[in-house]
C-alpha cells in the first residue's frame, strides 16, 4: 500500500471532518463574542455564567488538538467595526421615582377633562380627605366622632332631606332606601354607658338597657308580654301580640297544625315579617331553624335594633314598592303575625312579592284578626285574602284559632290551567326573579323553573354541603364542574377558619352576629357551622359579582344582595365580626375604600373584630385607614407563607 493512499484515507475519516468543523465553529464563536462584548453589557441574571477568558481557553485547547492532524489556516485580520449609536435619551414618564415612591414629576398623554369628573363620580363621593405624597404614597387624617344625634344613624334610611322631597308616601316610599350624596365622614359614637353585649344564649332573654336606651316599646307593648325593663336591663319574656303565652307554645301549635313543616329538617330558613323584638325567630333558633326577622325602621321604635342586640338574625326592610333584597325561593316558611300589611292592596302586589321569595311547596303562616274575628270589615278582609290566595294557586291547608296556613304549589301546572284573563298574570319568561337591587315589585306571579330547581333541596343538615341543582342556573364563568368549585371553596374556608380558631382563638371571642361582605357560595359561613361556633352569618353577595345568593339559601344559610359603594341597611353596632375576602381588590375601581371601611366601623360593635384577606399591594392603605378610624391593626401572613401575594389585616375596635 502506498503512503499517499494512507494519507488520503486519514483525510476522509469522519473523525477528522468533525474536528475541523468544531474548530471552525469555535473560531467563529470567539469572533462574535469579542464583537458584541464591545457594544453591550449584560444585565444581572438569576444564575451565574462563565467568563469569556475561560471560554477562550477551552476553545484554544480544542484547536491545539486539531492542529496536530491538520495545519490551521493563517489568522484573519480583525475587522474594525464602529459601535452602534447610543439610543435616544428617554423622557421619564412614570409616576414612580428612583426610590420607588410616588413622584409629582411625570408626563401624561392627551386626555379628556370630562373623563376625570366621570372617574371621580364612579369611585364614590368621599368627604374624607385622602392625600398622596412622594414619601408615603397614601395618607389620611385621623377621623373624628360624629355628633351624638347620630348614635342610631342608618345613612340610606335617615336621609330626611331626600324623604321630604318625595311626592308620595302612601305605599311606604319614605321607609325605602334614599342614600345621601355625601358619604359619612365621621365615626358613629356609642350611647353613654355602652357595655359589651351579653353573650348568647343569655342575650335571648335580656340585654343591657344602655346599649339600646329606648323605652317606647316598653310603653307600647309591655302589656303584650313583648318586653319589660328591670333595673339596668331589658327583659324579653318571649311573648308577642298574637302569642301572649310565649313563642314556644305558639311554635308547638304550628307544628301540630302542619306536621310536615318539621322545623330544623325540612324547614331550615324562615322569614318573619314585622317581627317585633324577634322572639319568634329567637325561639325558632333552638329548633335549628334560622329566621331572618325584618321590619321597617321606627314603625315601633328600634325593634330591629333590639333583635340584633339579642343576637337574632335581623335586617331593616319594608314591603313598599321595591323587591326585598332576597332571591326567589329563599324561605321554606314566611310568617306574618299582626304585621300590619294590607296584602290585598294594589291587586295583591305585596303578597306576590311574598310568593316570589317563598320556596315551592313552602308555607305562609298568617296570624291576624281577620282569621278569627267576625266584624264585618274583618270578614271582608278575610274573603279578599281567600280570593287572592286562590288566584295565585295557594292552598289553604289549615285554619285554627287565629292562625291560617297556606301552601305554595310545587310547579306551574295550576298557573297555566287557570281561566284565560285571570289576574294576576304569570310574569314574562324573561323576567329574572333573582334581580332585586333597586328593582320594583311586579304585579305578576313568578314562574317556577320547569326543571324543579329550588323545590328539591335536601333536608338540613345535609343541604349545607350537597351542591344544589340551582347551582347550574347561576350566571358565571366556569370552565370546570360548578359542584367542584363549590366543594373546593368549602374545603378552602374550612381550612382557613380552622386556622383562625386555632391560632387566633376565635372560640374565646364568643362570636354571635357575623357579617361576610363577599360570601361567594357561603363557604365561610358553612365552616363556622362545621366548627361548632354558635353564631349566625349575614352573607352578602355584592352586585358587582355573580349572583350566588340562591345557592346560599339552598344551602340553608341566609344573606342579601348589596352594593358596598353604598351603606348597608342595619343599625350601628350590629356585628361582632366582619369578614372581607378580596372585597377591596374587586371594588377599589368602583368604590371609595375609606368609605367602605367607615361603613364597616359603623356596623361593628365596640370590642368587635375585622378580618380582611386581600392583596398585599392594598395592605398599606387599608392599615392606614384602619388606624385613622382608631382600630388596632396588624398585617399577618396567610398559610401560604411570607412570599405569597395575599395578606390578612386583623383589626380590633376598642370598647
UniProtKB/Swiss-Prot annotation:
It comes from the Eukaryota. Keywords: Glycoprotein, Golgi apparatus, Membrane, Methyltransferase, Signal-anchor, Transferase, Transmembrane, Transmembrane helix. Gene3D superfamilies: Vaccinia Virus protein VP39. Its EC number is 2.1.1.-. Residues 1-15 are cytoplasmic. GO terms for molecular function: methyltransferase activity. This is Probable methyltransferase PMT10. It is a single-pass type II membrane protein. Its main location: Golgi. It is an enzyme of class 2 (transferase). The chain crosses the membrane at residues 16-36. Residues 37-655 are lumenal. GO terms for cellular component: Golgi membrane; Golgi trans cisterna. Glycans are attached at residues 54, 62, 125, 167, 288, 342, 411, 456, 592. It is found in: Golgi apparatus membrane. The keyword Repressor does not apply. Belongs to the methyltransferase superfamily. GO terms for biological process: methylation.
